[in-house]
Amino acid sequence: MMYTNNCVNCVNIPGNRPAARALVQGSPDYPLLHGTVSFYQTEQGVLVSAEIFGLPSHTQPCQNPVFGFHIHSGTSCTGNASDPFADTLTHYNPSDCLHPNHAGDMPPLFGNDGYAFLLFLTNRFTISEIIGKTVVIHDMPDDFTTQPAGNSGKKIACGVIMNSRR
């Protein structure tokens, strides 16, 4: 579908209710980090909305925190002492693309005094593909270059994507 500059109501959200949702919780090092990532199926693709609270913040100029944000192929937010979310595995990448073209590569979260809000439309995945997968927030921004996953640091928060229309 090609968009024109006279598009009105280009993204129609049927029922205004997300088809899937992930409740994100921080690791033991980030117990106040939490939020919701919602997925809405539209005719144009999947509309993703993320609202995150308790992100690490900086007080120095030019150090506004930016966080890597991805869908991972694992189905659990469990792990071990050194990597509490090790079981999230790698970025969701069913077509075996190079980074940053994994289906699970999403725009970064920009922190604002511990808060981030993000809204974007994608055709990289469908909602049925990602049910049961995990959403992960990393402590560093994705550089969109380094292989295989963008060098975005340690995993600081995770949520499992669940069907919300049951």
Region locations from a protein language model:
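N-terminal leader/targeting pre-sequences
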Residues: M1-R166
